[in-house]
């Protein structure tokens, strides 16, 4: 079994909790209060800036030019493509640049990004790849799940979010991360794989806490 599938199987419980969370279901059914989503967009904007820094560690830790380029491209994708989803809602919700500049990450947000950065700093390229994977992969799974709800993709407000995270372009980015981790772990020991599982499950749990933080706002 490939390492990515092992991690995926072990994350099913917490990912199921994420999918069924009222914040996520509110996006899919178009019933989520806009003020909660507005708070989420601001916090996720701050998150993405730190998330990109974890990918930057991939450039530092990479042992060959090809992987360095791939991580560099991933940073560009976060700041240009994924951030475009946020910029759409920043305009829609009339969030000002001053608001973004003055916003502070919540404890859950800061703890999540600090954990990823810490694991990336002290680990190898494998730990970096594992640390960033659950965010993108779980978002893809969530968006694909929500896209099956009747009329969710056509929703005037939340449809853009679901389309963005269930798109072929976003799926390609996630697949790159999955394939990279699998290629890096072909000769990994059981102990090394269990450490990667710990990182993957912990970041998945942080994903749940992030949804809950936004819902409780």
Curated annotation (Swiss-Prot):
Question: Which pathway is this protein engaged in?
Answer: Cofactor biosynthesis; thiamine diphosphate biosynthesis
Record protein name field: Aminopyrimidine aminohydrolase
Q: What class of enzyme is it?
A: hydrolase
Q: How does it assemble?
A: Homotetramer.
Q: Which residue ranges run through the membrane?
A: none
PANTHER family reported in the protein's UniProt record: BIFUNCTIONAL TH2 PROTEIN (PTHR43198), SI:CH1073-67J19.1-RELATED (PTHR43198:SF2)
The residues annotated as the active site are 135, 207
Gene Ontology terms: cellular component: cytosol
- Supply the Gene3D superfamilies for this chain: Heme oxygenase-like
Q: Does the keyword Hydrolase apply?
A: yes
E.C. number: 3.5.99.2
- Specify which residues bind substrate according to the UniProt entry for this protein: 44, 139, 165
Q: Kindly state which keywords UniProt assigns to this record, in alphabetical order.
A: Hydrolase, Thiamine biosynthesis
GO annotation, biological process: thiamine biosynthetic process; thiamine diphosphate biosynthetic process
Tell me a Gene Ontology molecular-function term this record carries: thiaminase activity
